[in-house]
Every structure is written in C-alpha cells, then in structure tokens.
C-alpha cells in the first residue's frame, strides 16, 4: 500500500512546530508509561492524523508526544503498528518515517520480547546486537536497498550504550533478536530452531523500523524488555497479560536507562562527528 508520507506528516508538523528533534523513541508493549518521565510539551492522537493506522493491541494507545528532556526535544510514539494487524510494511514504519522527516539524530526502538537464551529471564533488558529474519527478507526488501552495503546495527553506538548501562548499575544483556510475524506466539519447535540459530529473544516488531532507519541514515538503538520465556522453555502458557505485567515491573530501570541514553547521546554525537 502506497502512502503519502508528507500528508501524514503535515498535521504533526503543524502541532509540534519548527522544533529540532534530538531523539525519536518508539515504545513497545507495556512500556508506554515512560513518556510520563519526560516533560510533555504537546501531543497529538494518531486518530487526528491523515491516514495514520490505528493500533488494535492493548498497551498501544496511539499518541505521539513532543517532549523536552535534558535541554533537548524528543518525539515519543506511544502505540506501535504491527504487520499482523493487517497493515502494510509502509504503514508499519510510519513512526520511523516521521522521525526521519523531523531530522531526528537518533532512533530508540523498544519492544517486549520472549526470552530464548538461558542467559535471559523475565524482567531482563537486552540490547539488540544482531537480527534474525531469514523467512521475511522478501517482505522487507523495499525497506533496505541492496546498494547500502552496511549492517543495520552500529556496534560503536551499542558499545557506548552498554558502557552507559554499567555506569548507572543497570544490567543490560546483549543478544540476537529474531522476528516472528505473529499474531500467534511461536511454537516450541520454532523456538528450538531459533535456539539452534543462536537467537536470544523473539518478538513481532522492531526489525522493519531498524531496516528503514538504517537505510535512511538514522542511527538506531534497539532494546528488548524480556517479558516472558518463549514457548516451550517452561510449561507456562503465554499471554499478553504476562507481557504487560512484566513490563510494569521493569519500568523503573527501563526509564532510568532510556533517560540516561538520551541525556548522554550528544556526547556520542560530538565524538563520532569529530
């Protein structure tokens, strides 16, 4: 489905004005309360934006916030759109497109994910170092140009974030994030396959945003909140309620980490551009 991105962007631009956006943040399932940690300048409901799809998932309210923190402006998306809701890939990446149109310096993408690795448990935070989406490359081909010979994850930026986490005494794991199309959770057999492939966590979002951002020279930091064990790891039945409950438990350290990142990113920017 083709989208007139400029038409989508215009009402948001009118609402937010001519501001310089430092960081764009996409909040995953159960992590929407983070926006309360920032000074909210103004906001717009996605229902008031031309052709903006409506998220149908609990915990994704569908609002875009202009926030101020640490003497900078940030745009925060509370409400993600997923492919499994029936939307096109061009709709799913709308928050990333808008972030780029605002000339954001960085994109922080967050998600709730199921833990596969024995090193991960619910309430852990994982910095995404690599991606696994073998079966979806054809679907995502329009997001990543073959002429851009670079890896989507910036190792130096990830190392910077990891060092920040140690300074504020937050345990941040690192690992490989696998994409699953949803809407159903993965089967135990699929999880065993992903484990053999050295994947650490699995979820139903994030990779489209990372690919679009990388292809459009928008540096990305991607963080998973491990909200449950993946299917077959334990005998517990998976549910969205478990996802949101665990995200609520982890929100204090999650908020501290994200606030620290957006505060310290100018230091990385100055270092990497000198």
Predicted feature descriptions by range:
Residues 105-106, 200, 219:
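Short acidic/polar active-site loop segments enriched in Thr and Asp
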Residues 140-180:
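Metal-dependent peptidase/peptidase-like ectodomains
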Residues 1-149:
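Metabolite-binding pocket within alpha/beta catalytic cores that recognizes anionic/polar moieties
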Residues 164-200, 266:
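Active-site/ligand-binding-proximal alpha/beta "capping" segment
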Residues 204-242:
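Zn-dependent metallopeptidase/amidohydrolase metal-coordination segment
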Residues 99-103, 195, 214:
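Non-catalytic positions within long, well-ordered alpha-helices that form the structural scaffold/packing
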Residues 11, 15, 156, 160-171, ...:
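Generic non-transmembrane alpha-helical segments
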Residues 231-274:
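His/Asp/Glu-rich mid-to-C-terminal helical/loop segments that flank catalytic regions of hydrolases
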